[in-house]
Each structure stands twice: as C-alpha cells, then as structure tokens.
C-alpha cells in the first residue's frame, strides 16, 4: 500500500526505536531493538511509519531525507539538571587543583553559596536568557527532553523566581522541560542552626507551587551534613500528600539510607547513589524506583569511587544516567560525554547506555508516554547521528556526533560542516 508522509527518512543504517511499555530493568537493558537498512516516516509531527527500506520502497513524501547509512535514535533525555542559576564558578577549579578544601572555599563565600548569591541577584529575565544558552548546547548534543531543578535560591522569593524562569524557558525553547522543586537543596546560612524551620518554610510553598503548576516533582538532598533521613521523610511525605512525584539526591557520599527511603516512599527516582547500600538497592528494585546515576559529577570532582551500576543492573534496577548539569560539580551540557564515562567507569554496555539516555531517562521524569522512544503515534523527536552504528557514539568520546535533531517532526538543529568541500593539496 502506498503511503505519503510529510518527511521520510530513508537509507538509515541502524534505527533504534527503543519502544517499551515501561522502563527497562536489569537484564532487559541489554535487549536492544535494532532495525537495519531502515526508514522512518513522519506525518503531522508524529512518527507514522517505522520499518525497512524494502517496506518503504513505494512510499512518497513532501521531503525525502537520505540518511546515507547513518544511525537514527530517539531524542535523548537528560533527567537531572540544575538548569536555572546565576553566575559561574570557574575560579574554583584552580583552587581545588591546589588542594584547597571545599569547606574553605565555602567559608570564603564560594561553593554553592556563591551560586545562591548570584541567583538571588539575577533578574528573572537574566536567568531565562542564560538558561536558553545552556539549552541550545544541550539540543546540539541530541537532547530533546530534560528535567530542571530549582534549589539555588534557598529562600521563598528566589525559588519562585527559578520555577517561573524554568516554565518560561520551556514555553520558548524546543526542548521539553519537566520542573522539580528542590528548595531543600542545602541549609542556608540564615537557618544553619535550625534546618527544621527552613524545611517548614519550603514545605509552606508546596500548595501554591501545585496550584500554579510550577513543578511536577519535589526533591531533597539527603546526605551527611545536609538533611537527615527523618527530615527528608517528613518533608517528602508532605509533598506526596500534595500530589507531587518524589525524587531524592541520595547517598552521594555516605550510605545514609537515602536509597532505602526512596524505595519506602515509592520515589520515581533516587539520584547519585555513589554510597548506596545493598539493602538500599534492593528496596529501590522492589519499589520500582529508577536509579539516576551521575558519573560526570564523580569524574569532575576527581573522585575514584563511582556508583555501582553493575550491581544495580544485576539486581534488577532500571538505571538512567544524566549530566547533573550545574555550575559547581558538573558544568557540562554534553550527555554524549556522560555516555562515554558510563562505559568507561560504570562499566555499562552500549545497549544499557542507550536505554539509560532514552526510555529509562523518560520514565525517571514521568515522560515515558511522550519521550525517549520512536513508535507510531508518538512525537517525532529524532536524532540523526554522524555514526554508522550505536557503538560508535560512546566509543569516540569528547566529540559531538549529532548530524541533526528533529523535534515534533521539524529540524531544530543541524550541525554546520565547516570542512565540507575543503580540498587539501599536497
């Protein structure tokens, strides 16, 4: 039967649909769907056909795109970012290299306090403009959906400002943004001796945030020196009662019990997990909580111990990975680089990595029905890669392999070819 499309991508070398009814868990992460010599049809911004070139032989289209044997995948999903912030902290890199402890940097007004101060000082429009620049970079690396957290305000006024900025940016930019309220990111100096009162103040914001639809999820930093398991439980239960999905920054340094709490409360994800215990991993697996691993942060901080991705996958967890884009511990928008670090340091296979940055990332932010997959009837969020196979992207690290990015069936990014047509005489 002859079909007609708005756009037909043909001569695809490898096509990864990543179609799944739920997140891929454990051994399922190694079971990769793969079509070779494939075609993909787009109509009205949605995927209308996925199949082989033989099947597509008689199809017509308003525009026919010859992929010339390239790899095609869903748009990538970055499920943990701190997109909205003021300032930057490049001067701290040299201090860290000189062995200056973080607490000393913090004492001198650096660290997260510097970002809090800069974010408080920035106007909402300045935050929006800055965020769009970061989103443009993310888009260029093949990312079409992200999660964005507040958390650099640590006061009512600035947290509101961050949430409003995230919503405004999402309305202006092709990348879809899922917003998370992380008011409980750290203990501000004003409440150093009374963190419970600070958490009460943040909890008082929940009702209005929900009414204004400024966030879908609530997160808290459960870690030694920040918020205890009990404080986190109380705060997250209040969020759950308001109808928010739950997330945790859990056990980044110490096995405090954040992973166990995530499983207990049925959180959609627990993130970091470098110090997660065996019991915590088991509780997360039993609850269906997704492990969001952030190896770029471990890499940037120069630490040797990474999250135990292999143990998590072997125990049946769904694992995703993310940039953790932020100005202090992971200043990168490059999710492709994180894929390489996941291969080299987390010992994840290419098949596991592709599930982590597509379908599992989407489910970790409540977008399993709209992102991270290519299936008939779904939005045509597509990446065409300058690669012949899916192994190549994590293998050739530090390089942007994106040829073009499509959002809802339209090209929103295409990499310029600076050397195309250049002849070299010998």
Curated annotation (Swiss-Prot):
Its main location: cytoplasm. Pfam families: Amidohydro_3. Its EC number is 3.5.2.7. Gene3D superfamilies: Metal-dependent hydrolases, Urease, subunit C, domain 1. Keywords: Cytoplasm, Histidine metabolism, Hydrolase, Iron, Metal-binding, Zinc. Pathway: Amino-acid degradation; L-histidine degradation into L-glutamate; N-formimidoyl-L-glutamate from L-histidine: step 3/3. One of its GO terms (molecular function) is zinc ion binding. Binds 1 zinc or iron ion per subunit. Its cofactor is Zn(2+); Fe(3+). Belongs to the metallo-dependent hydrolases superfamily. HutI family. HAMAP family: HutI. Catalyzes the hydrolytic cleavage of the carbon-nitrogen bond in imidazolone-5-propanoate to yield N-formimidoyl-L-glutamate. It is the third step in the universal histidine degradation pathway. This is Imidazolonepropionase.
């Amino acid at each position: 039967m002859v079909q007609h499309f708005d756009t037909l991508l043909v001569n695809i070398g490898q096509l990864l649909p990543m179609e799944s009814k739920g997140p891929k868990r454990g051994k399922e992460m190694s079971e990769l769907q793969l079509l070779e010599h494939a075609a993909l049809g787009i109509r009205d911004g949605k995927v209308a056909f996925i199949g082989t070139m033989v099947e597509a032989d008689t199809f017509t289209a308003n525009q026919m795109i010859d992929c010339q044997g390239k790899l095609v995948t869903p748009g990538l999903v970055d499920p943990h970012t701190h997109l909205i912030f003021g300032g930057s902290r490049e001067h701290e890199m040299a201090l860290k290299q000189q062995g200056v402890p973080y607490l000393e940097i913090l004492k001198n007004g650096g660290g997260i306090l510097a970002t809090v101060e800069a974010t408080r000082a920035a106007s909402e429009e300045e935050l929006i403009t800055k965020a769009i620049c970061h989103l443009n970079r993310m888009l260029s690396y093949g990312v079409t959906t992200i999660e964005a957290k507040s958390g650099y305000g640590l006061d009512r006024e600035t947290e509101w400002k961050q949430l409003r900025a995230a919503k405004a940016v999402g309305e202006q930019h092709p990348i879809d943004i899922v917003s998370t309220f992380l008011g409980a990111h750290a203990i501000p100096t004003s409440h150093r001796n009374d963190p419970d009162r600070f958490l009460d103040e943040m909890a008082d914001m929940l009702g209005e945030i929900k009414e204004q639809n400024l966030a879908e999820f609530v997160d808290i930093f459960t870690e030694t020196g920040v918020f205890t398991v009990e404080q986190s439980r109380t705060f997250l239960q209040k969020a759950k009662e308001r109808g928010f999905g739950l997330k945790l920054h859990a056990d980044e340094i110490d096995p405090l019990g954040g992973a166990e709490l995530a499983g207990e409360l049925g959180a959609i994800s627990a993130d970091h997990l470098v110090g997660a215990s065996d019991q915590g991993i088991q509780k997360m697996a039993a609850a269906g909580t997704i492990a969001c691993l952030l190896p770029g942060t471990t890499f940037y901080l120069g630490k040797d111990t990474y999250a135990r991705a292999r143990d998590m996958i072997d125990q049946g967890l769904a694992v995703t990975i993310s940039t953790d884009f932020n100005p202090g511990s992971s200043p990168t928008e490059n999710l492709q680089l994180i894929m390489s670090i996941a291969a080299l340091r987390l010992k994840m296979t290419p098949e596991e990595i592709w599930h982590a940055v597509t379908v599992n990332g989407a489910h970790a932010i409540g977008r399993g029905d709209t992102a991270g997959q290519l299936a008939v009837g779904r939005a045509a969020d597509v990446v065409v890669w300058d690669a012949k196979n899916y192994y190549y992207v994590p293998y050739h690290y530090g390089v942007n392999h994106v040829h073009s990015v499509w959002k809802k069936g339209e090209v929103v990014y295409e990499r310029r070819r600076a050397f195309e047509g250049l002849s070299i005489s010998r």
